[in-house]
């Protein structure tokens, strides 16, 4: 039976998808208008043959393509499960190709991704700047939940938060200021409670615990 082989190649495909998922995130963060992180760029390296100013994420772009090659081997492995009378050799020619291709490619991709992450350049100041561009909108969910916990219905809470959020979108207003100027919101929450919902540290309070769990060590 080749079902165990199919499960093996499916697992390789899932790992490849995770590699691509991480790679796409890095590629997005390296976009010129975002620039929250980027692949290491050595002196004299060319980022684009046509536009000298660019610093393209060539390694993670390569990893995206390699991930597709690994996943390409999953379907043939699934098709190999159906053999005549539990045994013929129609699977053999397939496995002789996808076996080496999938495993070697994935091994290379994992090594490359490890290197990319080890040398990844991070720009925390740009992360903060990008967050601040939205004038507090990223905290809308916490305000919504706080209103419901204060006894407001979810529908009413949503309306209160949304109308203030839309003024930020449409008029460039400050979200916290709009909430403090909304009499319906202020009847439920005070200024200190609103300000508390805008604390970015709330969203990263478990980071050390997560790293400790993943790496099985104290951070």
Locate predicted features:
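Internal glycine-rich alpha/beta core junctions
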Residues: 1-83
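Glycine-rich cofactor/substrate-binding loops
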Residues: 51-219
């Amino acid at each position: 039976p080749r079902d165990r082989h199919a499960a093996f190649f499916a697992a390789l495909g899932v790992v490849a998808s995770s590699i691509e998922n991480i790679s796409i995130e890095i590629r997005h963060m390296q976009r010129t208008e975002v620039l929250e992180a980027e692949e290491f760029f050595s002196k004299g390296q060319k980022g684009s043959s046509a536009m000298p100013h660019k610093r393209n994420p060539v390694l993670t772009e390569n990893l995206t393509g390699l991930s597709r090659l690994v996943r390409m081997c999953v379907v043939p492995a699934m098709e190999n499960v159906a053999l005549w009378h539990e045994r013929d050799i129609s699977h053999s020619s397939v496995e002789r190709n996808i076996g080496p291709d999938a495993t070697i490619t994935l091994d290379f991709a994992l090594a490359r991704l490890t290197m990319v992450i080890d040398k990844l350049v991070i720009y925390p100041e740009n992360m903060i700047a990008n967050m601040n561009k939205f004038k507090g909108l990223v905290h809308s969910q916490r305000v919504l939940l706080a209103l419901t916990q204060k006894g407001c219905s979810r529908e009413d809470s949503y309306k209160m938060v949304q109308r203030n959020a839309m003024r930020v979108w449409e008029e460039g207003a400050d979200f916290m200021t709009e909430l403090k100027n909304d009499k319906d919101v202020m009847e439920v929450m005070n200024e200190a409670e609103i300000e508390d919902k805008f604390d970015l540290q709330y969203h990263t309070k478990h980071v050390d615990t997560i790293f400790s769990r993943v790496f099985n060590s104290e951070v």
